[in-house]
Structures are given as structure tokens and as C-alpha cells.
């Protein structure tokens, strides 16, 4: 690092002896702040997604206080500010609808204010990519502090995983093996503390992605939300944010193509969520890194899944932390030369390899397995292409049934999610265990927002027969806590005129994960005729933000960002407001 200290952005607010400097400093002082507290010091923004409507992030006020202490100790001045909290737990129709909105909030808050560096307080699923996208668009020094996973769920003396147990028990109710009272009894034991889902769902996956990308300190991903060490990490992150400003360590030096390759490999090792495919693409787009689905095949396929966590495995995030967390996984990969780019820089100024080469691994290789004893030998995201998904689709092998990953079945078609709900449990539905459930119009434009409805629950009559999985295909997403042989993110989506819109009841579809093929088994001429007969999707005139979303959202293979947000716009100081 250079010994020369960079010019502070905040000096263009507070460092001038003129009318503008007078006003900016004076307004800060109305909070009881003295000159020496902020004048000439790095101003560190604390970007907080706390909200009582986002239970996962309910403890962020306390975390922010510890970040502030770290900033002050390192000689900086902290300023906390709120941004849109797009938590998954309560927000309808889907938090994905507002991920880009939240990123715009973050970007404009950073650029328009006297902020030299920023600590991003993220937690629930979409908050991590949203804040990273916004910060990347500005390319300022930034460090991620996630809220951590909640405590293990407990029910009838056993551990239960948040999210995952909902899918399990709801299917058991439909199958008639438990009562609705049994189902509801588990409700109070699933979420026992603040924090994100305690499975390897999207929140934990994206926390691991942030750590693998190098944008958070080691162990950030797995420390439980209510563990005191979470506060210690927050304090250290505040200190480090000040040092990053002095070193001019911007996100563009960390979020390189090499960093994204590391994250893709890690996603395979941990059995991470398919949502990471969309989010990493969107983050990469904001910092100017080219990333596409072929990178997931090139880097991820063939990588064993060695983290034995639900929904792919047995354990929960508490056990993952006690076993050594992500640094232990990275050490295991590093010792086998499986980290693509161990020299990638991280926020603490060290490389990913340096941070993890001596990381301890605990627990007799149960939670974090050895590479020769994985839970799935080929756990990387499976990218599928074919006449049904010309721009691609994805499937998560670690959560799928191996016997179904090469399958040919007859399509049972639902034109939308409402039709699926209306028909799926109809005793007269023409479906058997070898059928393929196909759902349309659940993509970015069609839902809108690409909701997590792709893991369609199975027909009640098949559940009663003991069927536990079927091939399912849609242009939707699914929760990272879900499981099954589920083909997702079909692009182009049905609402954008993709071939998925042409599938008819009774068509035969072939899925071959080994070759990455998803094929609608009809003659090319027939498919061309169907495509020609497609009626242009009816333009939804909903107005407001949703109208903007529908008109500007990109397809899943492009990360579902807005077309006008792709690219890094930097943090050039705007003109004065007075």
C-alpha cells in the first residue's frame, strides 16, 4: 500500500472555510458534535438495514453501536444511516422485487453524502446483494458485516432448520402423516432468536459469498447472531473500515474476476443457494466484471459439496461455526489446491489464502467433511441449456435426487402460480411420479419479481403414495432453504416470450444434468410454429415502482438488475445543494 494518504471525500463538505463549509459543519453540530470529532477524520457510513419488519435484522441497532466504537477507536467518525430493508420474511410478493430499489437507495446515499468509506450491515437474503450492488456502483472502501444466523431451531428435543422444516412438515400434512396441530406446534421452535435462517439458505449463502469474495472479515459468515463474538467482529470491522479509507482500498481492488471465481467454487463446496447465481452476476455487473453462466460450469462443476448442512445435509449453522466456519472450508480447499485464486485480496489487506491457510477445523470431519467423503461428489450448480432454455436455467445438485437428474417425463403445465395452487391437489389431476411439473409466468417480469415459488409442492395424492420428489421446471426462483430436483431461472422467461411459454400439457421433456441439457421433445418446426403463434404478453400497467421494474429488469441469466443500473458510476462528489 502507498504511504500517501488519499484525499477524503468528506473534506469537500467539511474542509472549506467558506459559506458551504460553514453550513455543512454547522448542521452536523446541531447533534452535539464538536469540531475535533469529525473535522479532518475519515467519515465512515454505517449502512443499516434494521427494521422491525425484517426480523432477521432485528439486532442491527446493537451491531451498529459496536461498529461505531471500532470506527472511533481507529480515529474515524461514524455516521449511521438507514436504507430500505428488503427482508424476505414479510415482504410480498417477493423481496427480490425490491433488491434493485434497495441498491439504488444505497448508491445514492453514499454518493450524495460526506462518506469516505462504508460498513454494510446486511442479513436477510436480498439485503446482502442489494448493499454490495449499491456500494460497488460507487466503488468506495466498503466492508460487509452480516447479522449472523439465528440459534438452532428446537422441536420435540430435536434440531429443526428454519425454512427447510416448513417445506418438510407442510408436505407431511398433505401426505396425512402428521396433523395440522403437529405442524403448528413446530412454529414456536423454528425461530428462537434474532438472525437469519440457520440453514444454508440464501442469507447464509450470501454471507459466505461476501466472505469468499473478500468483502468481509474471516468468520463473518457463521458467527451466530446472538454470540458476543458477532459484536467483536462488528467492532473490528469498524476499525478496519477506517484503515481501508487511509489505504484507499476500494471495492474494485477486491471484487475482481478472480474473487468471483473463488465465490463460485465456494458455493459448490457449501451446497449454496441457486440465488447466488443471480446475485453474483448483478454484483459483478455493478463493478464492471464480466461473469456469466459458463463460469459456473467452468469453476463450479465437479466440485464436491463438503459442508453437511440443511437443506442438502444434516446440520445447521451453529454447528458450522463450531466446526470452523468458512475459513475451515477454505483451508480444506486450499490444501487441495482447489481455491482458484488464493492470492485474491480481501478487506483486511491479506489474501484469501493467507487468511485461511492455518484455520482450525473441528468436529471430526462431520460438519465440514473431507474432500474424499463429500455429501455430493459433484455439488456445483448445474447450468442447463436447450430449446426450452436458450439463455440457460439452473439446478442445485446437492439438494436434488440423483436418480431424477437424468429424466424424461410428460409435462403437467400450470400457466401461473395461481393456477398451480388451484389444480395441484385436485384428485383428478392427470399426474404420476414420472411427470414433470411445469410452471410459467413466475419470472422477473411475469410475477413480477421472480418469486421463490419454483419448488412446487407435490400433488397430495402422490405424497400419500410415498413420492418425495419430482422434476419441476419454472422461470421462478426457490428459497435457499428448499430442496428437490428443481429446474429454476429458465431464460428467457415465459412473460418475455421464451420457449417455456409454448409448453403444452402432455409434451415430453428431457432433463440431463450430466450434459447440461433441457429439451422440449417436439420437432423444431413445431416449436417454431408455436413461437410464431405466441401472443405478445399483455403489458401490465400497474404504475409506480412495479411498472419501472417490469419495463427495465433484465433476465435471470443477466442477474435481474435494471438495464440502466449496470456498470460502475463511481463516487464523484456532486455539486453543492446551496
Ranges and model annotations:
Residues 54-58, 90-98, 118, 123:
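Short coil/turn segments at secondary-structure boundaries
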